[in-house]
C-alpha cells in the first residue's frame, strides 16, 4: 500500500536525487545520436511566470523523451544579465538610501550590481527546479560571466575587423528617464487621446498665402527641415520647391513631394522633422534634407540646434528661440502652442487618437533621438575573416535568410516563416550600444583626437595607437548581443570542442513569437557567420499564456497566476495581497479583489508540479494564445490522484502474488480478451504518443495519455480485472496480474516526460515487480516501443461487444430510474453465445445475475433494450405512476432551463456582441439540454405504451 498522494514530499525527494546523481548531464558518447536544446535565458532579475512554466514544460518534456530514447542529451540553462532591467532594480535600491549611481561612480556601482546578482540572481533557476526542469546545471551560464565576456569581445572585434560594426549618427528610441537608447522590444505603443494641431506655414515669397500643416507634436517644430506633400495632390503641386516660413523661428524650409504623405490624412501637408521622427528620417534621407536636433538627452530644448547631414557629419548650427531653451519637451509644447495662437499661426486643435511609444521600464514617452551609436551592418558584405562554408561571403541578413529558405532552419508552425521573411526583407542596421553601466562594455578606446581603436584589451588598443593614455568607450552592448551568441558561446567556441561537434546545431528552439526578430533571427545570423552552422534545426513557436478570459497576464492588471502558487497553494489573503500590490491603476484594487474572490474563493489549493505540467502540455497546440483555465489544472490534479489510486489497486492485487514474472515467468498465462485488448491499446498509445512527442504536439500526447490511462486502463480494464481476479482460474489470474503490472509500468514511462515526479515515485515500486527495473531512475529507462504483433483485432472486436452490452444495461437502468443500490437479474436473448461477455456484467452493472436464455420471459412491465441483435431484459418491477411523476418533474425542470437559454440566445444583438466563447458555451449547453429532454420524453412515451 502507498501512502496518500503528497506532491510536495515526492517532488523535493526526487529532484534532489536526480541532480545529485548527475542524471541531467550528457554522457558525451559521440557515437550516440545527440539531442540538445538551449533555454531562452530568463532575466536574472526575474521570477517564474506562466510563460516560463509553459515553455519549460515543453523543453523538459522533449529533453526527458530523448534522454529515454537513448540520446546523448544536453539541455543548457543560463540567465541573462538584462542590462536595463537589472540596472533599474539596483538604482531603485540605492535611491531608497538617497544615493545615485553617479554618487558611487561606475566601478562601485557595478560592485553593487554584482552583489545584488549574487543574492537575488538564483531565484528563477531554483523555481525551474521546482517545475522539474532536468537541465544540465553543471553547464549553467550567465551572459556576463568570464567565458561569455571573452566570447562577446572576440565576436565584436572580428565583426569590426570585417567591416560589419561601425559607429555613426542614427535615429534611435531614446528613453530620457533612463538616459539610454532602447530596443523596439522595450517600447510599448499605448493608445491615448491626444490632439492634432493645425498650424499655418506662410509662403516666404507671399506671406499672405500659407499651407496648413497638421501635427501631433508641435514641440518638434523647431527641428523641421521641410514640409512634404503628395506629388499627386493637385492642391499643392504648384508649391513644390517653394520656401515656407517656419513659425516662431523665422527660418525658411522647402516644400518637397513624397509619396509617404497620404492625401486624405489631416490637411495633406506633413512637417518633416528627420531628427525626431523615424518616418521623417526616411523621407529626409530620400531628399537629403538636414538633420536638426533640438533636444538634449533629457528631452529638454537646446539653446543651439545641432545640425548634421545623412553621413553623420556636423553642419553649421544655429540658435533656437531663447525662451524655449532648457524647457522640458512637454512644457515647451504648452508654451509654443500658446505662442502660435498669439502670433496667429494656430488654425485649430482637433481631438485625435494616437499611439504613444512608451518605455516598458519607466513609462516615459520615447523620443526618437539622433545620437552617436554603434551599429552592426545587416546588409553589408564582410571583407574577409570568415570560416569556409556555404554562408561565406553573404551579409548577415542574407545568411539568416538562406538558413530558413534552404530548410536548414524550419519554423513550427510553418506560417511563422512569412513573418520572419517580412521582417528580414525590411531589416535595418542593428543599434547595439546602450548608455548604461551594467553590461558588456564596448571594447573600443579613443585617443585625444577622437580616433577609435577596437581591440581585445587595452594593451592591444595601445599597440594599435602607438601610444598610451587611451580612454575606454563608456557605452555597453545591447543585452541581445550577448544573447545572440548563446548557441556557440555555451559550447566552447572559438575552440573546436566535442560539445560544438555534438550539440551544434541544437535540435529545436522553443520560444514565443514576440522575440523572433530580436533573438531568433540574430542567433541565426551570428551562428552561421562564426561557425558556418545553423544554431538550431527547428524553431517551435508557442502561444502566449493569457488569463481565463483571454487577457494578457500582467502584474499591473492584477490577473497574474504565479506557477509556484499553483504548485504549493496559497491562501486567499496572501493571494489578494499579491494581486492588488503594484497595480497600474490602484483604484482598480476593489475590482481585482472581487474578481479574485470569485475565481479563487478559498485561495489556490496545492496542485503539485505534475498537475501544472500536464495542464501546460495540454495547452501546447499550435495556436497563438493559451487561455489558462484553473479548472483544467484541478482536473489534472485529479488525474494524478487517479494514477496514484490505480497503482495502489494494482499493488494490493499483485504484491506477494504470482504475477508471471521472475520464478513463474515460464508458467502458462491464460490471457483473456480484455488483457489482449488493453495490451493492444497500450501499443496503439505508444505509437500515438511517440508521434506526438516527435512533432512537438504535447497537447495530443497529453490528450492520448489521459484517455488511455483514465478511460481504457482505469475505468475499463481495472474493473474487468476485478472480475478476472475473483472468478478466473490460476492461469487467468496470473495473466491478469501480469497485464496489470506490465501496462501500468509502460504507462508510467510514457507519462514521464510530462509528469516526472509521480511517475518516478510509482515506477520505483512497480518496475521491480515486473522485471522492468533496467535503470536506477525512470528517466534513464528506455521509452516504450510499439509491438504491432500485440495489436489483436479480434480482441478489439470482442471488447467492443462487451462495452456495448455494458452500455446498454447501464442505459436501461438509467432510463427506468433503477437506483444504484438496487440489483436485478438480466436476461439476454441472442443467437450468439455470449457467455464470455455475460460473466463481466453482474459486477460492472450491479446485477444479481446475467443469464442467456432462448427467449425472454413474459413480463409486461420489465424494461427491454436491443444491443447488436441481442435483446436485454431487466427483471424488475417498475412503479409506473411514480416513475411517470419523476420523469414529468424532470421534463418540467429541463423545459424551464431551455426557455431561459433560448430567450438569452434570441435576445437582439446578443450573439453578435457577447464574447464568442460565451456564445459557443451557451449553444453547447442548449444542445445538451435538448438531448436530455429528448431522452426523458422517450422514456415517458415507453411508460404510456
UniProtKB/Swiss-Prot annotation:
Q: Which domain of life is it from?
A: Bacteria
Major localisation: cytoplasm
Which GO BP terms sit in this record? valyl-tRNA aminoacylation
Q: Coordinates of motif 'HIGH' region in the sequence?
A: 42-52
Q: Recite the UniProt keywords alphabetically.
A: Aminoacyl-tRNA synthetase, ATP-binding, Coiled coil, Cytoplasm, Ligase, Nucleotide-binding, Protein biosynthesis
Alphabetized GO MF terms: aminoacyl-tRNA deacylase activity; ATP binding; valine-tRNA ligase activity
Matching InterPro entries, A to Z? aa-tRNA-synth_I_CS, aa-tRNA-synth_Ia, Anticodon_Ia_Val, M/V/L/I-tRNA-synth_anticd-bd, Rossmann-like_a/b/a_fold, tRNA-bd_arm, tRNAsynth_Ia_anticodon-bd, Val-tRNA_synth_C_sf
Question: What residues form the membrane-spanning segments?
Answer: none
Per UniProt, where does ATP bind? 555
GO CC aspect terms = cytosol
Provide the top EC class.
ligase
Q: Which reaction does it catalyse?
A: tRNA(Val) + L-valine + ATP = L-valyl-tRNA(Val) + AMP + diphosphate
Q: Which residues form a coiled coil?
A: 879-945
NADP keyword on record: no
**What is the annotated role of this protein in its UniProt record?**
Catalyzes the attachment of valine to tRNA(Val). As ValRS can inadvertently accommodate and process structurally similar amino acids such as threonine, to avoid such errors, it has a 'posttransfer' editing activity that hydrolyzes mischarged Thr-tRNA(Val) in a tRNA-dependent manner.
**Sorted alphabetically, which HAMAP family does this protein's record hold?**
Val_tRNA_synth_type1 (MF_02004)
| Domain topic, free-text comment | ValRS has two distinct active sites: one for aminoacylation and one for editing. The misactivated threonine is translocated from the active site to the editing site. The C-terminal coiled-coil domain is crucial for aminoacylation activity.
Q: What is this protein called?
A: Valine--tRNA ligase
Amino acid at each position: 500500500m502507498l501512502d496518500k498522494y503528497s506532491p510536495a514530499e515526492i517532488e523535493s525527494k526526487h529532484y534532489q536525487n536526480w541532480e545529485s546523481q548527475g542524471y541531467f548531464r550528457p554522457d558525451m558518447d559521440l557515437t550516440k545520436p545527440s539531442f540538445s536544446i538551449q533555454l531562452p535565458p530568463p532575466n536574472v532579475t526575474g521570477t517564474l511566470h506562466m510563460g516560463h512554466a509553459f515553455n519549460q514544460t515543453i523543453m523538459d518534456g522533449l529533453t526527458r523523451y530523448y534522454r529515454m530514447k537513448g540520446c546523448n542529451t544536453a539541455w543548457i540553462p543560463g540567465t541573462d544579465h538584462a542590462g536595463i532591467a537589472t540596472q533599474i532594480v539596483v538604482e531603485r535600491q540605492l535611491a531608497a538610501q538617497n544615493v545615485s549611481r553617479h554618487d558611487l561612480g561606475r566601478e562601485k556601482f557595478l560592485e553593487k550590481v554584482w552583489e545584488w546578482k549574487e543574492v537575488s540572481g538564483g531565484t528563477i533557476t531554483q523555481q525551474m527546479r521546482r517545475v522539474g526542469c532536468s537541465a544540465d546545471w553543471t553547464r549553467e551560464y550567465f551572459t556576463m560571466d568570464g567565458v561569455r565576456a571573452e566570447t562577446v569581445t572576440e565576436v565584436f572585434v572580428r565583426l569590426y575587423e570585417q567591416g560589419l560594426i561601425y559607429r555613426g549618427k542614427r535615429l534611435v528610441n531614446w528613453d530620457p528617464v533612463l538616459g539610454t537608447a532602447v530596443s523596439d522590444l522595450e517600447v510599448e505603443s499605448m493608445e491615448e487621446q491626444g490632439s492634432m494641431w493645425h498650424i499655418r506655414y506662410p509662403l516666404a515669397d507671399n506671406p499672405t498665402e500659407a499651407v496648413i500643416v497638421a501635427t501631433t507634436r508641435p514641440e518638434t517644430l523647431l527641428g523641421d527641415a521641410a514640409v512634404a506633400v503628395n506629388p499627386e495632390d493637385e492642391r499643392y503641386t504648384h508649391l513644390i520647391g517653394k520656401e515656407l516660413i517656419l513659425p516662431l523661428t523665422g527660418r525658411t524650409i522647402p516644400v518637397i513631394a513624397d509619396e509617404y504623405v497620404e492625401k486624405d490624412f489631416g490637411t495633406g501637408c506633413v512637417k518633416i522633422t528627420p531628427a525626431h521622427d523615424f518616418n521623417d528620417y526616411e523621407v529626409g534621407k530620400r531628399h537629403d534634407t538636414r538633420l536638426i536636433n533640438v533636444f538634449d538627452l533629457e528631452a529638454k530644448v537646446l539653446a543651439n540646434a545641432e545640425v548634421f547631414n545623412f553621413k553623420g557629419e556636423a553642419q553649421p548650427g544655429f540658435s533656437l528661440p531663447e525662451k524655449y531653451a532648457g524647457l522640458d519637451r512637454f512644457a515647451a509644447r504648452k508654451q509654443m502652442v500658446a505662442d502660435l495662437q498669439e502670433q496667429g499661426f494656430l488654425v485649430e486643435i482637433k481631438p485625435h487618437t494616437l499611439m504613444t511609444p512608451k518605455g516598458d521600464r519607466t513609462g516615459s514617452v520615447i523620443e526618437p533621438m539622433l545620437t552617436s551609436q554603434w551599429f552592426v551592418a545587416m546588409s553589408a558584405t564582410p571583407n574577409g575573416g570568415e570560416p569556409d562554408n556555404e554562408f561565406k561571403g553573404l551579409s548577415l541578413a542574407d545568411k539568416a535568410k538562406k538558413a530558413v529558405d534552404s530548410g536548414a532552419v524550419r519554423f513550427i508552425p510553418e506560417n511563422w516563416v512569412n513573418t520572419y521573411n517580412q521582417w528580414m526583407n525590411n531589416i535595418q542596421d542593428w543599434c547595439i550600444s546602450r548608455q548604461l553601466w551594467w553590461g558588456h562594455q564596448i571594447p573600443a578606446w579613443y585617443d585625444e583626437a577622437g580616433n577609435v581603436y577596437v581591440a581585445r584589451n587595452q594593451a592591444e588598443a595601445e599597440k594599435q595607437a602607438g601610444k598610451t593614455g587611451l580612454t575606454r568607450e563608456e557605452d555597453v552592448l545591447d543585452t541581445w548581443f550577448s544573447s545572440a551568441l548563446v548557441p556557440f558561446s555555451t559550447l566552447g567556441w572559438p575552440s573546436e570542442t566535442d560539445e560544438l561537434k555534438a550539440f551544434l546545431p541544437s535540435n529545436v528552439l522553443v520560444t514565443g513569437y514576440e522575440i523572433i526578430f530580436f533573438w531568433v533571427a540574430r542567433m541565426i545570423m551570428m551562428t552561421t557567420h562564426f561557425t558556418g552552422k545553423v544554431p538550431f534545426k527547428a524553431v517551435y513557436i508557442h502561444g502566449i499564456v493569457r488569463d481565463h478570459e483571454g487577457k494578457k497576464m500582467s502584474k499591473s492588471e492584477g490577473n497574474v497566476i504565479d506557477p509556484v502558487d499553483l504548485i504549493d497553494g496559497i491562501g486567499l489573503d496572501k493571494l489578494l495581497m499579491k494581486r492588488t500590490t503594484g497595480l497600474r491603476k490602484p483604484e482598480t484594487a476593489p475590482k481585482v479583489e472581487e474578481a479574485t474572490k470569485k475565481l479563487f474563493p478559498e485561495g489556490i489549493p496545492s496542485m503539485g508540479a505534475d498537475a501544472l505540467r500536464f495542464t501546460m502540455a495540454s495547452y501546447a497546440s499550435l495556436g497563438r494564445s493559451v487561455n489558462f483555465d484553473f479548472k483544467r489544472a484541478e482536473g489534472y490534479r485529479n488525474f494524478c490522484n487517479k494514477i496514484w489510486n490505480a497503482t495502489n489497486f494494482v499493488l494490493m492485487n499483485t504484491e506477494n502474488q504470482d504475477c508471471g514474472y521472475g520464478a513463474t515467468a515460464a508458467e502458462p498465462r491464460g490471457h483473456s480478451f480484455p488483457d489482449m485488448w488493453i495490451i493492444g491499446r497500450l501499443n496503439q498509445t505508444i505509437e500515438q504518443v511517440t508521434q506526438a512527442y516527435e512533432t512537438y504536439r504535447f497537447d495530443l500526447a497529453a490528450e492520448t495519455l489521459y484517455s488511455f490511462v483514465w478511460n481504457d486502463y482505469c475505468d475499463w480494464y481495472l474493473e474487468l480485472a476485478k472480475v478476472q481476479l475473483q472468478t478466473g482460474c490460476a492461469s487467468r489470474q496470473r495473466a491478469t496480474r501480469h497485464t496489470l503490472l506490465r501496462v501500468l509500468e509502460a504507462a508510467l514511462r510514457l507519462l514521464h516526460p510530462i509528469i516526472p515526479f509521480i511517475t518516478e515515485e510509482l515506477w520505483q515500486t512497480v518496475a521491480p515487480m515486473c522485471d522492468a527495473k533496467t535503470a536506477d531512475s525512470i528517466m534513464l529507462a528506455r521509452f516504450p516501443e510499439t509491438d504491432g504483433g500485440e495489436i489483436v483485432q479480434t480482441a478489439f472486436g470482442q471488447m467492443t461487444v462487451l462495452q456495448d452490452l455494458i452500455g446498454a444495461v447501464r442505459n436501461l437502468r438509467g432510463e427506468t430510474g433503477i437506483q444504484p443500490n438496487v440489483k436485478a437479474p438480466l436476461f439476454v436473448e441472442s443467437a450468439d453465445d455470449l457467455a464470455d461477455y455475460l460473466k463481466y456484467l453482474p459486477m460492472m452493472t450491479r446485477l444479481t445475475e446475467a443469464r442467456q436464455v432462448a427467449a425472454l420471459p413474459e413480463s409486461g412491465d420489465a424494461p427491454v433494450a436491443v444491443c447488436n441483435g441481442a435483446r436485454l431484459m431487466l427483471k424488475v418491477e417498475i412503479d409506473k405512476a411514480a416513475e411517470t411523476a419523476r420523469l414529468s418533474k424532470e421534463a418540467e425542470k429541463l423545459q424551464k432551463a431551455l426557455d431561459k437559454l433560448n430567450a438569452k440566445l434570441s435576445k437582439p444583438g446578443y450573439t453578435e456582441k457577447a464574447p464568442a466563447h460565451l456564445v459557443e458555451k451557451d449553444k453547447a449547453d442548449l444542445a445538451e439540454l435538448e438531448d436530455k429532454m429528448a431522452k426523458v420524453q422517450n422514456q415517458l412515451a415507453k411508460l404510456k405504451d
